[in-house]
């Protein structure tokens, strides 16, 4: 059975060229059927947000995505999230995958040069997203 990977943008409109590059990369890397879903433009539940840190709880985001999408064993979900997140014991993360590998998330803010006060570099930003997808 061929693996199916669904790219799910959250609060982010995935540019067509990035979507195409990401689909090609994942298809080649995992010999999978890859498709990009319609973006989720709803905020995750606010109880998944840590107000003190001003960051989202990544492991809780993964559980929310799993419950919302219910992928079967042959389907993998990669969420592209336009918000900052952390995992217990870490100040921040660029991305995280769950233990059984059905759902993962990439968090965009810290992949952008502008986050560090540098000039926008979309080419580097896209490369970072593609690298973090695997």
PLM regions and their residue ranges:
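Fold-level signature of zinc-dependent metallopeptidase catalytic domains
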Residues: 1-13
């Amino acid at each position: 059975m061929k693996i199916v990977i669904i790219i799910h943008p959250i609060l982010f409109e995935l540019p067509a060229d990035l979507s195409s590059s990401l689909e090609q990369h994942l298809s080649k890397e995992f010999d999978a059927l890859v498709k990009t879903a319609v973006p989720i433009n709803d905020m995750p539940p606010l109880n998944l947000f840590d107000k003190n840190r001003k960051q989202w709880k990544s492991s809780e985001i993964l559980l929310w995505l799993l419950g919302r999408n219910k992928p079967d064993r042959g389907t993998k979900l990669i969420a592209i999230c336009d918000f900052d997140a952390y995992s217990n014991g870490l100040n921040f993360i660029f991305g995280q995958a769950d233990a059984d590998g059905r759902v993962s998330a990439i968090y965009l803010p810290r992949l952008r040069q502008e986050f560090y006060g540098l000039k926008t570099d979309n080419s580097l930003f896209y490369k970072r997203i593609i690298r973090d997808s695997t």
